Amino acid sequence: MNAMPKNWYWVLGASYCLHYNNSVKPSIFVVEDDPDISRLVRHHLENDGFSVRVYSTGANVISDAERQRPSLFVLDIMVPGKDGLELCRTVRQTPGLASVPVIFLTAKSSEADRVLGLEIGADDYIPKPFSPRELVARVKAVLRRFERPLPPSPLKVGDIAIDPAAMILTVGGQTVPTTATEFRLLDYFARHVGRVFSRDHLLDSVWRDTSYVTPRSVDVYVRRIREKIEPDPENPRYLKTVRGAGYRFEAPK
């Protein structure tokens, strides 16, 4: 067997993401009700080679995405009809869309707003006012995580089965939907059973681009993973907290 490339877990999710050197442009769905901002976002993304569809409300976004799945969503939170938070929740609950990255671009900029955005499944959170060049860089950074080939080997720990090629998590024989970031983080833990990792180590190893995430982001994702894999998330069997050090993944005895 060939040696597994170092840090391949950075890029889990390539099955849905288009490569930049592909003849098909990556498609971005932008939901923004301010026409000046939407024109600015469209201009900079299209200038960088992306195909962009802009929506001023959330009404038709999901139905259009199911017909033509985008590479990434850029969502304002405060839009008419189905707002950005509801759209993100719907994306994460919709088969075929659940692993598509979501970036919030919003005037809601408090720490509580950022944490809520991450908790419901966002992959990045950009407060307004924003730099268009930074937005394009963030879009590229999120897509880069998923653009390379996946390792083929599935993994099983206790009742948890991880199939990176299909990006499928099963727990007790039941398929459990995850976001791309949740999947990468869980896979990283499961391939290093028994090792303790600090939050900073996990940020460097799993997120790769750490410009928008903080150690608290790791806690948010750990809590969400526990809700999906643990019979009792308050008393975890698999994903344990090591006080003062970080987290450790354990195989059940």
Label for each model-derived stretch:
Residues Q68-V74, V79:
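Active-site beta3 strand of CheY-like receiver
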Residues K25, R69-S71, G96-P101, Y212:
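His-Asp phosphorelay/catalytic-motif detector in bacterial-type signaling
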Residues M1-F29, F249:
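Non-catalytic signal-transmission and effector/linker regions of two-component phosphorelay proteins
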Residues D36-N47:
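Charged docking surfaces used in two-component/phosphorelay signaling
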Residues E32:
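Conserved acidic carboxylate
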Residues G49-T57, V61-D64:
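Short hydrophobic/Thr-rich beta-strand motif most characteristic of the beta2 strand and flanking loop
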Residues I168, G172-Y238, V242-A245:
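Positively charged, aromatic-enriched patches within helix-turn-helix-type DNA-binding elements
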